């Protein structure tokens, strides 16, 4: 492969590194596995880059490769819904200038939303994560998942409704 080819791939792919990693974390539930998925995605994409059609949606193409890589790597395995913790048993901390009370409330909110998303079926999770977390347009989500745009919209509506219901239910139980 020539250098121009590699530079073109780099320019298109590197800005997607963080969004792909975030999506891989959500899919796998494991930061180490997510890093492996992203690395494998980049290798596969670089090998197939010559077949990528200029003018089509590169972002959707990369997310589709990542998703397919995840699905083939997980064949026959049950997905783990546990969060990966560091060696001390604590989730990695985020530097914050909030008061301790606000930080605790924000962490509780984040955990509730994450738990609500984790309860969704994988087809609803994928659509919700791509549309709402990765901020993809409906058409991009449809291209990434190889489903009609109407299916994206209906799955997204159902996913949002289920998340909302779970949060309302969880908050109602705490009162």
Predicted regions: what they are:
Residues 1-22, 32-35, 46:
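A short, charge-rich alpha-helical start-of-domain segment used by transcription regulators
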Residues 18, 50-64, 149:
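Short, aromatic/basic-enriched loop-to-helix "N-cap" motif that marks the start
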Residues 2-9, 82, 106, 139, ...:
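C-terminal edge and immediately downstream basic/flexible tail or linker adjoining helix-turn-helix-like DNA-binding
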Residues 118, 122-126, 131-151, 165:
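Helix-turn-helix DNA-binding module
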Residues 53, 64-85, 106:
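Arg/Lys-rich amphipathic alpha helix in sigma70-family domain 2
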Residues 80-106, 137:
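Internal acidic/polar
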Residues 2, 40-57, 76-78:
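Sigma70-family region 2
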Residues 36-43, 56-68:
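Structural recognition of an alpha-helix C-terminal capping motif at a helix-to-coil junction
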């Amino acid at each position: 492969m020539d250098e121009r080819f590699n530079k073109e791939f780099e320019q298109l792919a590197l800005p997607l590194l963080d969004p792909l990693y975030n999506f891989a974390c959500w899919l796998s539930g494991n930061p180490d596995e997510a890093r492996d998925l992203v690395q494998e995605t980049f290798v596969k994409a670089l090998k197939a880059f010559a077949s990528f059609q200029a003018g089509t949606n590169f972002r959707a193409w990369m997310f589709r490769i990542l998703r397919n890589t995840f699905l083939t790597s997980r064949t026959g395995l049950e997905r783990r819904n546990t969060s990966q913790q560091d060696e001390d048993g604590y989730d990695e901390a985020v530097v914050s200038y909030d008061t301790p009370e606000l930080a605790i409330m924000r962490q509780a909110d984040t955990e509730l939303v994450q738990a609500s998303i984790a309860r969704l079926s994988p087809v609803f999770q994928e659509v919700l994560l791509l549309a709402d977390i990765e901020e993809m347009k409906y058409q991009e989500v449809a291209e990434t998942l190889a489903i009609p745009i109407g299916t994206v919209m209906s799955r997204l509506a159902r996913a949002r409704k289920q998340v909302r219901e779970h949060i309302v239910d969880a908050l109602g139980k705490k009162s």
